[in-house]
A protein has these predicted regions:
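Sec-dependent N-terminal signal peptides
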Residues: 5-14
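N-terminal amphipathic/hydrophobic interface segments
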Residues: 18-138
């Protein structure tokens, strides 16, 4: 019971720190299991990971928030991402998704994205869900 409270308290502190240091307006991360490693300044999320921000929803098997680098590294089989904006709709998937503090997104490994009746497949797709700008690297 004591460990459960420590995880909840640590997660609460993580949430406060995430919202105070990053320009991401609203990021909500849910998972079945959370581990906070204070000395590494990392928070790990396992099983049924769902990440919601102002612009995107991401589903995956696991995620790690690195406070030093201000990036969330998301892994899945595959991980999936979709927009929350009607005027800039897209959906995609990749083995790994890197979600940066400015909400720029990298889809890495067997990456694909669909938007405006266009499909892109590449090993690396970089895009900004705010502006819709997309680049890829084959």
């Amino acid at each position: 019971m004591k460990n459960k409270h420590l995880i909840i308290i640590s997660f609460f502190l993580f949430t406060l720190d995430l919202s105070s240091k990053n320009p991401i307006n609203h990021v909500k991360i849910e998972s079945d299991k959370v581990e906070f490693i204070k000395n590494l300044r990392n928070v790990s999320f396992f099983s049924n990971v769902n990440i919601n921000s102002s612009y995107v929803e991401i589903s995956a098997n696991s995620a790690i928030f690195d406070q030093k680098k201000e990036v969330i590294s998301i892994s899945g089989d595959p991980s999936s991402i979709k927009s929350k904006k009607e005027n800039n709709f897209f959906n995609g998937e990749a083995e790994t998704i890197l979600f940066f503090s400015d909400e720029k997104v990298h889809l890495v490994g067997n990456a694909s994205i669909k938007f405006d009746n266009i499909s892109i497949n590449s090993n690396l797709i970089i895009f900004n869900p705010k502006t819709g700008k997309i680049t890829s690297d084959n």
